[in-house]
A protein has these predicted regions:
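NAD(P)H-binding glycine-rich loop region in Rossmannoid oxidoreductase-like domains
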Residues: 45-85, 94-97
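Conserved sequence/active-site signature of Rossmann-fold short-chain dehydrogenase/reductase
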Residues: 43, 111-112, 167-169, 181, ...
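Conserved Rossmann-fold NAD(P)-dependent oxidoreductase catalytic core, especially the SDR/UDP-sugar
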Residues: 3, 89-134
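Conserved beta-loop-beta element that borders a ligand/cofactor-binding pocket
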Residues: 107-108, 145-173, 183-185, 194-202
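SDR active-site strand-loop-helix element
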Residues: 10, 35, 60-66, 103-109, ...
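Active-site helix of classical SDR
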Residues: 136, 140-143
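Adenosine-cofactor binding site in Rossmann-like domains, unifying the SAM/SAH pocket
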Residues: 25-50
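C-terminal substrate-binding subdomain of Rossmann-fold SDR/epimerase-dehydratase oxidoreductases
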Residues: 10-15, 19-27, 191-313
Length: 313
């Protein structure tokens, strides 16, 4: 990409999209196009095609998505599949029709099988069944990355895909019914501290292993890949480090300063037992993460405190 290339970031108000915009601006890119949902509903094919025909972006970062944690995924299976599939197909297809030079599709590590080898290499995609708690979202994301691959094969496009691990950081969603584990913990321990509660109850038994990547590090990788990678196979984005949910809750409590008890509701689901990405491909390309987990949680908590309305989204 040239510094004045016309770059469209879809989903710029979300955590990932806003981080990509910050990273592009930090690196000196000056021609960044964004649209709010009110200005451009990506689930409307006619509106998306009109936008691409008029604006003709040269590069596209597709970071728009309908996202949520276990509760949201289980209660709105059809919505998660339909909304994500239609918006990504609309954007990718319109980009192809209007001669976009390169597109980068942002997915999720939930695309990999529930019992995938650990750490999970890119090659394990579609080798066995998915985790049921987020299967609808995963299937939509798999469809998006495969559509990019098939366009490359049939029409010679240069569309790439990136599969991040669990993300956190500025502009996250802290709503208890619609967010992921780390922002939920930040909100829960903050509210427990403020209320002086003696204990906090968390789901499951704390045994699942998880990996977390600070969103600004992901954004740095996204720009790096747009400039340095072409290929049909997706690229994993993570740290290559994991910890138990129990250790994570203790770390969040430490950062926030909550000193009460942590209890576990074992009647609630754990989710996938282990999720660690094989990040050797990104490393071979010359990229590695920068932000350690405790430092990132401190930055995320500062963002939460400075933007209390995010907890209501």
């Amino acid at each position: 990409m040239e510094k004045n290339s016309k770059i469209y970031v879809a989903g710029h108000r979300g955590m990932v999209g806003s981080a990509i915009v910050r990273e592009l601006q930090r690196q000196g890119y000056t021609n960044i196009i964004t649209r709010t949902h009110k200005e451009l509903d990506l689930t409307r094919q006619d509106a998306v095609e009109k936008f691409f025909a008029e604006e003709k972006p040269e590069y596209v970062f597709l970071a728009a998505a309908k996202v949520g944690g276990i509760i949201a995924n289980q209660s709105a299976l059809a919505d998660f599949m339909y909304d994500n599939m239609i918006l990504e197909m609309n954007v990718i297809h319109a980009a192809w029709k209007n001669g976009c030079k390169k597109l980068e599709f942002l997915g999720s590590s939930c695309i990999y099988p529930r019992m995938a080898p650990q750490p999970m290499p890119e090659s394990c995609l579609l080798t066995s069944s998915l985790e049921k708690t987020n299967e609808a979202y995963a299937l939509a994301k798999i469809s998006g990355l495969k559509y990019c691959e098939y366009l490359n094969r049939q029409y010679g496009t240069d569309y790439i895909s990136v599969m991040p691990t669990n993300l956190y950081g500025p502009n996250d969603n802290y709503h208890p019914g619609h967010s992921h584990v780390l922002p939920v913990l930040i909100r829960r321990f903050h509210e427990a501290k403020e209320a002086g509660l003696e204990s906090v109850t968390c789901w499951g038994d704390g045994s699942p292993l998880r990996e977390f990547l600070y969103v600004d590090d992901l954004a740095n990788l996204c720009v790096f890949l747009m400039n340095n990678y072409s290929g049909n196979e997706t690229v994993n984005a993570g740290t290559g480090k994991e910890l138990t949910i129990k250790a994570l809750t203790e770390l969040v409590a430490k950062v926030i300063g909550y000193q009460g008890r942590i209890e576990w509701d074992t009647t609630r689901p754990n989710g996938t037992p282990r999720k660690l990405l094989d990040v050797s491909k990104a490393a071979k390309l010359g990229w590695t993460y920068k932000t350690e987990l405790e430092d990132g949680i401190r930055l995320a908590y500062e963002d939460f405190l400075n933007n209390p309305m995010r907890a209501e989204r």
